[in-house]
Amino acid sequence: MITRMSELFLRTLRDDPADAEVASHKLLIRAGYIRPVAPGLYSWLPLGLRVLRNIERVIRDEMNAIGGQEILFPALLPRAPYETTNRWTQYGDSVFRLKDRRGNDYLLGPTHEELFTLTVKGEYSSYKDFPLTLYQIQTKYRDEARPRAGILRAREFVMKDSYSFDIDAAGLKAAYRAHREAYQRIFDRLQVRYVIVSAVSGAMGGSASEEFLAESPSGEDAFVRCLESGYTANVEAVVTARPDTLPIDGLPEAVVHDTGDTPTIASLVAWANEADLGRTVTAADTLKNVLIKVRQPGGDTELLAIGVPGDREVDDKRLGAALEPADYALLDDDDFAKHPFLVKGYIGPKALRENNVRYLVDPRIVDGTSWITGADQPGRHVVGLVAGRDFTADGTIEAAEVREGDPSPDGAGPLVMARGIEIGHIFQLGSKYTDAFTADVLGEDGKPVRLTMGSYGIGVSRLVAVVAEQHHDELGLRWPSTVAPFDVHLVIANKDAQARAGATALAADLDRLGVEVLLDDRQASPGVKFKDAELLGMPWIVVVGRGWADGVVELRDRFSGQTRELVAGASLATDIAAAVTG
């Protein structure tokens, strides 16, 4: 196929958009691949749509190869199925809700587990119909509070979601492995650098869960790896190594001290080291108690206290994952006024216990450890408060931040921090949704069998940005051949009529060989054409320029930057096609 730039709906920009934060956002807009419509909403222009479709093609290839069958559900979905699973409430403000003219409630689908489950239940009734894998590539909607980074975090996005249905756990595990391997092939074909990390399932439910993260310093997802063992996990899934308990007998009694104006960990540590406690005190010796209010979907709000070592902050993502599907918020001044037993900056376990506030602590706070913490009175702290003797928590919670150098959960060495962009997520859902809809089939023995499910997602439109993030340079985009809009960008850099005719004929020859060509036949200067060719990022650039008169054209590799001259003879198109196909 030949596309002439003189006819292509395209306008490139010389300057970065003012609101663009990451390279992919800047380049995709500058190169005319996408255009913003509103916060989190983008139009796909011809070149961008070709990239999107190429990525979809790779995904379809690999999904079909593992026996997936493509279907398509509506994006506009009724309330009832989501009420059955309680996700109508759980989603909160993160989905778009609307009513029809009769007052019936709908949402714009963020995911489709309910519809997949109901459809399979309605169509199949025997164990003989399984295993089954269905998938769709469809537009999804989420009301992102802060859409950012272009199409990396948008309110409307294209996603591939697939679901496996099996009659037993062995079938589910086989489907999970098949999807995991298919995802690896997909991302390898797209030339995305990625890691597979242990993850939490969140509102999706289920047991085993892994994320595919594209490595990128601009990624929103923090993950850790242990170089010694290969352990990887996103920060939400890291399990803190729990220390052994310590003997309590012989520990000195806890003592309450007047500590003055010490509402922060830093001021408390400063006081402790001036108070001659007989040892050097660090923030790790203090116990920080953070108060939040938690509301389960459809339930009442309760107070919850989180205790962490004072040298650690509470990580919002880890806390949110631990409390899923509940909503939570820090207490504000009005909340403290309603609960005068909570003395801001001086909260301790004693007042929490006396007022029946649920108290969850970091796994490092084990019996026998001694802490400096609030005494529930302004300007007073207790020194030597021993876990298991002076206070007992209601349980543990993984809410403290994970840091570089923390021990790996497998004990093999320290953790190294990195950042990535989530491009895929796979879950072993089990029977969460089939339980909700009583999705049973008759087993081999004639008795009902509850179906078990797996859920597997890929961010299709996000992958366009991810490839752009990982494959660009200071000049512009550098698309891998599997996703590039065209195989070859043929630049006519000579106004001579014979050169133009030769370039047009070369484009036709390449087309006959199955090479997709973007022909820059515009009446523009060579400099403008070269800048656009580098910005647009096709993997190969062919230049028909001044060398045409001497029977020579240039072939440039956009990735390596290397240029070589080819003889403009009968085999020219074949030579270029050979380079393109590798």
Curated annotation (Swiss-Prot):
Compartments, record wording: Cytoplasm
Keyword Protein biosynthesis among UniProt keywords: yes
Disulfide-bond pairs as recorded: none
PROSITE patterns: AA_TRNA_LIGASE_II
GO aspect biological process, one term: prolyl-tRNA aminoacylation
Reactions performed catalytically: tRNA(Pro) + L-proline + ATP = L-prolyl-tRNA(Pro) + AMP + diphosphate
Top-level lineage group: Bacteria
MF (Gene Ontology): aminoacyl-tRNA deacylase activity; ATP binding; proline-tRNA ligase activity
Domain notes per entry: Consists of three domains: the N-terminal catalytic domain, the editing domain and the C-terminal anticodon-binding domain.
Oligomer status and interactors: Homodimer.
Name recorded for this polypeptide: Proline--tRNA ligase
